[in-house]
Amino acid sequence: MFYKIAQKVMFQMDPEKAHNLAIGSLKSTANSPLNCFYAQKLQAAPVEFMGLTFPNPVGLAAGMDKDGECIDAFHAMGFGHVEVGTVTPRPQPGNDQPRLFRLKPAKAIINRMGFNNKGVDNLVANLKAAKSGAMVGVNIGKNKDTPVEQGKEDYLICMEKVYPYAAYIAVNISSPNTPGLRSLQYGDLLDDLLGSLKAKQKDLAERHGKYVPIALKIAPDLEPDEIEKIAESLIRNEFDGAIATNTTLTRDGVSGLVNSNEAGGLSGKPLNSLSTKVIKQLADCLKGQVPIIGVGGINSAADALDKLDAGATMVQIYSGFIYRGPELIKEIVDAYRVKSK
């Protein structure tokens, strides 16, 4: 009920201003009696993924809490994990505003944020300050002004800094809003990146005395042969997990709507079937050797279960969470519990 009222107010505002207001409000009320407006206790529905045990299969996708400012608040809502980021080595402002657009009739969002964040050192401070014991994944990327050929170094810098504080690390090479980034999904550039990250992981595991799994986040705009090559590279480099998918550059299901011609990645309900299709293709190629988090367009428990049936082990929500609120978390967890009996 409270979320519906808050949503009505925020949907009258500019989307980015509403986002910043929400983050500020959650940050100031976390771990206080005021979190009663959004906190909910969910029944346990544990899931094993990448060698870790998560309290339930529903996570918050990267992009909502880029700087890790509201980890405890999102944990209180019942998320089984919170993926923060995308974070880059140095702070950067992202693309010019406006850069975030609602397509309300389609329950969709277009964004061209461009990895706006306060930098990895700021994120690490927030990870250290979190009190809830939430399972936190850290989504890492490269700075816009780092040439793609040197992008690997940005990922290694971020990985080294967040490693001691992350439950897992997600490698984002699939945002459409950083020029050239998606080229890292192909051929030698991909193999070189994954191999370097695995070598770094081995070094950091020995140094810190703990193994932090790493997962690759891929785009939905891939041909079947491209998905197959990514799967082969994941297996060859012994990656721990995959996250499918990021936002799409297609505009299926939104043509003619206000804001549908804006540049950027489309998320929300229109992405659902495409991302589920990619999950199925990826799962078929991986043959159980690398587990998958399914994300993209989940707006109901049925959408989430479809992704699990397609081959995902866990799911993440973002746009659906904006449109539905914390009730969507509970709805999916309850459906998962019934399915798992």
Swiss-Prot record:
CC cofactor: FMN
CDD domains (UniProt xref): DHOD_2_like
Enzyme class, broadest EC rank: oxidoreductase
Pathway named in the protein's UniProt entry: Pyrimidine metabolism; UMP biosynthesis via de novo pathway; orotate from (S)-dihydroorotate (quinone route): step 1/1
Subunit structure: Monomer.
Residues annotated to bind FMN: A62, G63, M64, D65, K66, T86, N139, N172, K217, T245, G268, G297, Y318, S319
Reactions performed catalytically: (S)-dihydroorotate + a quinone = orotate + a quinol
Membrane topology term: Peripheral membrane protein
Name the UniProt record assigns to this protein: Dihydroorotate dehydrogenase (quinone)
Active site positions: S175
Superkingdom of this protein's organism: Bacteria
Classification of source organism: Bacteria, Pseudomonadati, Pseudomonadota, Gammaproteobacteria, Alteromonadales
Residues involved in substrate binding: K66, N111, R112, M113, G114, F115, N172, N177, N246, T247
InterPro entries: Aldolase_TIM, DHO_dehydrogenase, Dihydroorotate_DH_1_2, Dihydroorotate_DH_2, Dihydroorotate_DH_cat, Dihydroorotate_DH_CS
Organism, scientific name: Shewanella loihica (strain ATCC BAA-1088 / PV-4)
GO terms under cellular component: cytoplasm; plasma membrane
A Pfam family matched in the record: DHO_dh
